[in-house]
Every structure is written in structure tokens, then in C-alpha cells.
Amino acid sequence: MAALDTFLFTSESVNEGHPDKLCDQVSDAVLDACLAEDPDSKVACETCTKTNMVMVFGEITTKANVDYEKIVRETCRNIGFVSADVGLDADHCKVLVNIEQQSPDIAQGVHGHFTKRPEEIGAGDQGHMFGYATDETPELMPLSHVLATKLGARLTEVRKNGTCAWLRPDGKTQVTVEYRNESGARVPVRVHTVLISTQHDETVTNDEIAADLKEHVIKPVIPEQYLDEKTIFHLNPSGRFVIGGPHGDAGLTGRKIIIDTYGGWGAHGGGAFSGKDPTKVDRSGAYVARQAAKSIVASGLARRCIVQVSYAIGVPEPLSVFVDTYGTGRIPDKEILKIVKENFDFRPGMIIINLDLKKGGNGRYLKTAAYGHFGRDDPDFTWEVVKPLKWEKPSA
């Protein structure tokens, strides 16, 4: 057990071959294709998959000429689903498409059938979204989440570059970190447990799997300072994981929302991101809330921060904005809330402009659909840019 002044916290991740993540990636690949040709596309694209089948369905209004079947097959192929024995054959599986136009009732309420100015655009739905930041890592993200996510990305890297040729696309990771509470801030002490369950071919032994995962996945990802002789490793603890991908489990868009965000830290309003254009505040509201929380922590105003924003369908102004710094703020939270409101425009149309969220192409949203939407060093992740905050510092 951890000492009394410390505690254990666990985050998990799945890599791009997990069936739910496959669906997220297909949905966001469709969104990218729509926005690349028509930045005003309205997209709500869901994907589901099971053995030998992928289906895309939802509501899309776009001037883009989108070949849905081609996008599905390309996305699955790029993940590594190239034959039935790895879980799905991208070139021969069934692809079903059931796409309709956006409801005219929603269209008139949100964007007035494209007649409203940006500042007048209403939220695409009701809901509440959260952004979170913490000073425990350079990314200003929780360490347990960062490590679980990077282990998953590394699994894919060593599969695709041939370092571990026995790997197959599906896989899950989980990291338990021992933390110390420092007046509300979270200070990582050590990694308590590392769990990796990865799909593999028939040829490899469990001993080889464990040795390769330690050498080629865990060692390059987890800093040495966090590992000690007491760290526990569970490497493919079920003993066999040959059947995977959609053959092993059904998949659905929007089933991995905690993996997409903060690994269980902070809070979540419940709305998924993938397959949604930026008028959907589930996505754009969460992105600007992350930028606000990150900017507060990066500025030194707090060591830890959560921001909540809420909306009503068709209404531009948020219903509420909330800030909590968990007792780590240098100034009172009500002052930090004032700074957030003065520096960030939470109206959906203005979020879209300020974060350039209509820009498709370059696989922009597809990139977000695996290995997390936050804490990534990529110019397409505009919400990760720290905004210099304007505020009146109280006189000494």
C-alpha cells in the first residue's frame, strides 16, 4: 500500500487498433474529408463495427464530394487491418453507409441555414464541457494519462516499424501512479503498476511478449526516475490475445471519452468528440475550456485548474462558466474566473474562428481520434496554444 500521505491514481488508454478507436478514426476521417472541400460542412458522423463489417451513419450536410466507402477502407488499412486474421480485412469487409442531411429544425436554430454571422451562431446542442490542466508534466496534463497514452502510441510505433513484428493492431494500456498531495497540487512520486494487453500473432511466446514490451515499449516511454524494484508489471495477463479488433469486440464512435481527455482526472460532461463539426459544442466547447485551463496554469496563476462551460441549443452565449483551482490559485478563484471570461470568447462561432476549427485536410481531426485530443505538440491542435492573459494585477 502507498504511504498515508500519498495515494494511487490509475488512467488507461487504448491504441488505434481498438474497435472503438477505429470507429472514432473513421468518423473523424469523414469529418476531415467534408471540411477539406467545404469548411461549412455540418457533420454528425457515427461509426460502428463488428466482424467483417464497418457502418457509417448519421447526419451530414456538405457540398463536398465524399466517397464514404473509400474513406472507411483507407482508414482501416492505415491502422493495419489488412486481413481477417488480424481482426478485419479493409479491402474485403462489408461497408454500409446510411447518411442523411442535418435536420432543418436544428439548422434554423443553430446557424439559420448559414445566414447567421459568426457571433450569432448558436450552440449545436445543450450540454456542459470541461477543460483541465495540471503542472505535473511539461504538457500540463496528468502523468498517469500521459504515460498510458504514450505506451499505446509506442505499441503502434514498434508494430509498424517492424521492431516487434509479432504485434497486431489492437491493444490496451493502463498506468497506476503514486501521487503526493501538495496543497491541492498533484506531485507524481513513482509508477506503481504498468499494465499492457496487446494483440499478438500465434508465433510468439508469453515470455517473448513480456521481454519485448519491457525493452521496446516501457523503457523508452516511462522515465527511469518513476520506476523502482517495487513497480508491478502485468504484461498480457490474460495469457492469450490473438483474436482482436472488430473480430474480438464490437466498436462504436464515442466510447472512449475519458481516454480522449484527461484519463479520469478533472471531469467530463459526457459528450464525445469524433465525427462532429465544430458547431457541436461537445467538441469546440471542450477545446476552448482546455485552452483556458492550460493558459491559467501556464501563466502561473494556479498549479491545477478546471474550467466548465455550458450551453443551450441555438443560444450563442454560454449559460455558465465555472473555474476551480483546487486551492492552488495565487489569487481567489472568483478573480481567475473574471480573467477567463475576459480573455476567452465562449460563443461557438467565435471559438471556431479563434481556434481555426473549420480547417480540414492534413488529417487534422483524424489525428485527434487516437492518442488523445490534449497535451499534443502539433500545430493543428490550436487549442493547445497557451494564450497570454490580460489582467490587472492587484497593486502590492
UniProtKB/Swiss-Prot annotation:
It is found in: Cytoplasm. InterPro entries: ADOMET_SYNTHASE_CS, S-AdoMet_synt_C, S-AdoMet_synt_central, S-AdoMet_synt_N, S-AdoMet_synthetase, S-AdoMet_synthetase_sfam. GO terms for biological process: one-carbon metabolic process; S-adenosylmethionine biosynthetic process. The keyword ATP-binding applies. Binds 2 divalent ions per subunit. The metal ions interact primarily with the substrate. Can utilize magnesium, manganese or cobalt (in vitro). Binds 1 potassium ion per subunit. The potassium ion interacts primarily with the substrate. GO terms for molecular function: ATP binding; metal ion binding; methionine adenosyltransferase activity. It comes from the Eukaryota. ATP binds at residues 18, 170-172, 238-241, 249, 255-256, 272, 276, 280. K(+) binds at residue 46. L-methionine binds at residues 59, 102, 249, 280. It catalyses: L-methionine + ATP + H2O = S-adenosyl-L-methionine + phosphate + diphosphate. Keywords: ATP-binding, Cobalt, Cytoplasm, Magnesium, Metal-binding, Nucleotide-binding, One-carbon metabolism, Potassium, Transferase. Its EC number is 2.5.1.6. It holds the Pfam family S-AdoMet_synt_M. This is S-adenosylmethionine synthase 1. It comes from Oryza sativa subsp. indica (Rice).
